[in-house]
UniProtKB/Swiss-Prot annotation:
This is Urease subunit alpha. Its cofactor is Ni cation. Substrate binds at residue 226. Ni(2+) 1 binds at residues 141, 143, 224, 367. Carboxylation allows a single lysine to coordinate two nickel ions. One of its GO terms (cellular component) is cytoplasm. The active site is at residue 327. It comes from the Bacteria. It comes from Actinobacillus pleuropneumoniae serotype 5b (strain L20). Residues 136-572 form the Urease domain. CDD domains: Urease_alpha. Belongs to the metallo-dependent hydrolases superfamily. Urease alpha subunit family.
Length: 572
């Protein structure tokens, strides 16, 4: 006989279900569950007097030799995902990959158990009833200035870091390039202990092909062109020729000073080939004042970096000082001051907010320690979304913010994965992908995860005093867990590399332990493939007033005087 209970009691026991609204942090963003995959009355819950026990929701007969038995079951969890939507389900993990989104349990005693989601004696279980699961974030603009960035990134929910550098050298301070085989090899060896997936850009600034090819063979997953090395048409053409031949992506920081041409000349050199543009608004660098127009082209995958996200009353002042440091400028040199002033434009930064909300800008990233904060990609994304809701209203949803939420989460999960040919491995919680999962309490969403899983094993978590009698006493702060230790770490994270380097067996050459996974399909994508962020309207910029127009309409917004997910979360 069925038992009817009040919705409030159900939510208190098993978490929200279809129609329930969940507030994200202290933002004004509300997510409503669209679909619930769980069978009412057969929910899996672990604990004293609960259902996950022998002969009930846990099978008594299934051994791990049965390929349908899970290694880890995350039960009753709310999922926010750019591809799956906003749903309620159990997540099944086996061999470090997601094998099921559905109903876990014991098919001998329960109805509607997803066939490959059996809970057995070999299954670890975590109650997700009052948590939100998201895919691990992907940051595609990493200056590898110091290895400690990885810990700060994972503590904000970033599990994949793509960029370049070799430590605190001037070249790395300014550009995201790991130049040449020697440096690439050393960086692979140096990053074995880091708890995140990693990919390196080779230096793309060369007008001849062979010096570029050898870096791809050495393990670069792509090439980075930067104006400080000379972003000339010849360099752009050469890098894209190599990328087309070897199936890797090209990222570009274009020519702020317009030394070798204007935006139109750069687009002519690109010649319709796919390219990933960094800080496409321009404050981080790029053709002044109209690099923002690049976002209208169907072959351009446009990204932002987080120091301009969102536009606030402090943005302009902060940027001038950052720029002087990162690009080795001198306030006593008039030309250097003019260079800085040309890049920092309130009008285009304001427009960037709106272009994100319209789905014209597709990717969010950090620019770590080089005019960006590596531990704030996720936070800045949701601050931007909240600011846009306050200033522009709803995006056509009926009583919730689901579409806006899916648009914004795509910017740091699936879209950077698509841009760099790794979406078959990461970027969403779809079946078959690496179990890189971030768990959040709703009130801390976007700021401080509960824990982060890498390939199905807990890597980092908020943890209390290890000498306490229970896990929760203060001081509570992020600590590396077993998944970030010793050989478990090298088994729980991967390197993303070129197919040419896999064929060259760099894993054996370099003596590295982490799995190397080849990027694929980098040259076949376009703006049309980016999830919820594929708009290509006509964009114009007034060369004197810097006003930005989209399809003829002037777009601008006021700077924020306060943002959510800020000081109240960082008192301690």
């Amino acid at each position: 006989m069925a038992l009817t209970i009040p919705r409030s009691q159900y939510v208190a026991t098993y978490g929200p279900t279809v129609g329930d609204k969940v507030r994200l942090g202290d933002t004004d963003l509300w997510a409503t569950i669209e679909q619930d995959f769980l069978t009412k009355g057969d929910e899996c819950k672990f604990g004293g007097g609960k259902s996950v026990r022998d002969g009930m929701a846990q099978s008594s007969t299934s051994t791990r030799d049965n390929p349908n038995v899970l290694d880890f079951a995350l039960t009753n969890v709310m999922i926010i995902d750019a591809k799956l939507g906003i749903i309620k389900a159990d997540i099944g993990i086996r061999d470090g990959r997601i094998v099921g989104i559905g109903q876990a349990g014991n098919p001998d005693t329960m109805d509607n158990v997803t066939p490959n989601m059996i809970i057995g004696a070999s299954t670890e279980v975590h109650n997700g009833a009052h948590l939100i699961a998201t895919a691990g974030g992907i940051d595609t603009h990493i200056h590898w200035i110091c290895p400690q960035q990885a810990q700060h990134a994972i503590e904000n929910g970033i599990t994949t870091m793509i960029g370049g550098g070799s430590g605190p050298a001037d070249g790395t301070h300014a550009t995201t390039c790991t130049p040449g085989k020697f440096n690439i090899e050393r960086m692979f060896q140096a990053c074995e202990a880091l708890p995140v997936n990693i990919g390196f850009f080779g230096k793309g600034n060369c007008s001849m092909l062979e010096p570029l090819k050898e870096q791809v063979v050495a393990g670069a997953l792509g090439l980075k062109i930067h104006e400080d090395w000379g972003a000339t048409p010849a360099v752009i053409d050469a890098a894209l020729k190599v990328a087309d031949e070897m199936d890797v992506q090209v990222a570009i920081h274009t020519d702020t000073l317009n030394e070798s041409g204007f935006l139109e000349d750069t687009m002519k050199a690109i010649n319709g080939r796919v390219i990933h543009t960094f800080h496409t608004e321009g404050a981080g660098g790029g053709h002044a004042p109209d690099i923002i127009k690049a976002a209208m082209y169907p072959n351009v995958l446009p990204a932002s970096t987080n120091p301009t996200r969102p536009f606030t009353v402090n943005t302009i002042d902060e940027h001038l000082d950052m720029l002087m440091v990162c690009h080795h400028l001198d306030k006593r040199v008039p030309e250097d001051v003019a260079f800085a002033d040309s890049r920092i434009r309130p009008e285009t930064i304001a427009a960037e907010d709106i272009l994100h909300d319209m789905g014209v800008f597709s990717i969010m990233s950090s620019d770590s320690q080089a005019m960006g904060r590596v531990g704030e990609v996720v936070t800045r994304t949701w601050q931007t979304a909240d600011k846009m809701k306050a200033q522009r209203g709803a995006l056509g949803d009926e009583g919730n913010d689901n579409f806006r939420i899916k648009r914004y989460i795509a910017k740091y999960t699936i879209n950077p994965a698509i841009a760099h040919g790794i979406s078959q491995y990461v970027g969403s919680l779809e079946v078959g992908k690496l179990a890189d999962i971030v768990l959040w309490k709703p009130q801390f969403f976007g700021v401080k995860p509960e824990f982060v899983m890498k390939k199905g094993f807990i890597s980092f978590a908020k943890m209390g005093d290890p000498n306490a009698s229970i896990p929760t006493p203060q001081p509570v702060f992020y600590r590396p867990m077993f998944g970030a230790n010793a050989k478990a770490n090298t088994e729980s994270a991967v390197y993303f590399v070129s197919q040419a380097s896999v064929d060259a067996n760099i894993k054996a050459q370099y003596g590295i332990q982490k799995e190397t996974l080849a990027v694929k399909g980098c040259r076949d994508v376009g703006k049309k493939d980016l999830v919820h962020n594929n708009a290509t309207p006509e964009i114009t910029v007034d060369p004197e007033r810097y006003e930005v127009r989209v399809d003829g309409e002037h777009i601008t917004c006021e700077p924020a005087t306060k943002v959510p997910l800020a000081q109240r979360y960082f008192l301690f």
